[in-house]
Amino acid sequence: AFELAVAWESARSTERGIPPAVAEFLDKHELTRGSRLVIGLPELQVDFPGGGHQSQTDLWALLRVRDHLVSVAVEAKSGEAFDKPVEEWLKDISPNSGKPARLAALREVLCLGETDLAQIRYQLLHRSAAAVRMAEEYGASVALLLVQAFGGTRDQPSRSDFSRFADLMLCASDSEGPTRVGRSTCVPLLVGWLDCPTAVEPTLADAV
């Protein structure tokens, strides 16, 4: 989260308000090309049915692209996992647990039907659904889950989990820019993984 904050804070005075690496990444898809930041909210919580913990994105950003808005859930990684696989997340739940209702809501938002989710990391489902939910709330016509990875080789296990999630969503995981999923979500959903360098002193200074 620190690296993410530095990257975005250091870009706030730029013309587009987006970190250069992110801007370059977004420019590789027609639905996000030329994005400019409208608002960015760190640790935004998004409600879903079922109670329990809300979906808290590391950063939620609303971007403007020509004549439309894009809702972006940004998840930072630096060696940590995407929470538990769904199978483990559901293990030993009580009869009164809201988790089944929460998972059903995520399935509906992401148009997953009865697809097997046992080995899918729960956080990836939650954050991508949050991007779609916030798109609905703010009238955005596109949603994006963006993973900004700062951990280098330490993030390889998470990259593998992201690839498994992309397979679930019927899209590629190795694109150099955002990829549109094959699921028929209420607004087009894009996903993307971006490897980023750690902050250096000039970047830290710009963020202060």
Which residue stretches match the model-derived regions?
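Short catalytic/ligand-binding loop motif for oxyanion handling, primarily in non-cytosolic enzymes
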Residues: 68, 80-85, 136, 153-157
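Acidic-basic catalytic patches of nuclease active cores, encompassing PD-(D/E)XK
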Residues: 1-52, 64-65
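Short, mixed charged/polar active-site loops
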Residues: 54, 68-71
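Conserved catalytic cores of phosphodiester-cleaving nucleases, focusing on short active-site segments
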Residues: 59-61, 70-78
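Short, glycine/acidic-rich beta->alpha junctions
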Residues: 51-55, 123-126
